[in-house]
């Protein structure tokens, strides 16, 4: 459980610290006061990434040289410092030089309004979801993904520089390396999606008439991937890129057997993604034997009162949960309320 959050120059929070004393934390305040930034800081400290922007320097407050996040979780101090030149990560004040050794020390599951792009967005956004979640629990996946990206970059560079290439020896060597790593990523993604579908079945017993399924859509089968790399060199040379592989994979979220992208309303889409995050939470617990921290940004908006109560009742008491809201939350559940105003806590009890 996180017991302390300390931020410096992070977004609009210049000098912020709050102590946490309960598993369920409600962060309340008007829009723009920094509620989402608190969740983003926790996500950043866990994954070294922002869920809001690919431009990391945006997290550094304007005209400041750095941003930092310190979290105390189960007596372990996690710290990440961001400058325009890079990141520095430490655990208990000892530097962790390899990001691969740092990721997975603290596991989180995030829901944000941007996650609706898992339904409406591009394949690259859905691949990013697969990669981020698998990286948190599997060092092997992270290592394979980094290797795949490195080999793919080499192969694409070779394709671009040699439009008249006739000797495919080196191209084929890179192709074999790409295949060997790629099929391992393929297998892990497939197992991950199968596992989430099993979790969906359990969750759906509590959500009446709400059938959700995840359908993996690999760009190419393992057999055809190898065949492509061995026989389609001319095609790849012509396009100056590797035109097939796991870097083009996708998945669909189905609602009652139909593609949610085409059949689900905005409110239903939100519930589908919420269900996905709850399934993910249970999957992480099953695989790692640890409880991930759940971060919910504006999760209750667009849900009617019945759905809100149902959702709140599904939150496991084993997981620490942070929820942001612009509206007051009432009910019998025990929670710590943090009232935020212009980047400062005016009440935390």
Swiss-Prot record:
Coiled coil: none annotated. One of its GO terms (molecular function) is ATP binding. GO terms for cellular component: cytoplasm. One of its GO terms (biological process) is SOS response. SUPFAM superfamilies: P-loop containing nucleoside triphosphate hydrolases. InterPro entries: DNA-binding_RecF, DNA-binding_RecF_CS, P-loop_NTPase, RecF/RecN/SMC_N, RecF_2. ATP binds at residues 29-36. The keyword Cell division does not apply. Its main location: cytoplasm. Gene3D superfamilies: P-loop containing nucleotide triphosphate hydrolases (3.40.50.300), RecF/RecN/SMC, N-terminal domain (1.20.1050.90). Belongs to the RecF family. NCBIfam families: recf (TIGR00611). The RecF protein is involved in DNA metabolism; it is required for DNA replication and normal SOS inducibility. RecF binds preferentially to single-stranded, linear DNA. It also seems to bind ATP. This is DNA replication and repair protein RecF. It comes from Acholeplasma laidlawii. The lineage of its organism: Bacteria, Bacillati, Mycoplasmatota, Mollicutes, Acholeplasmatales.
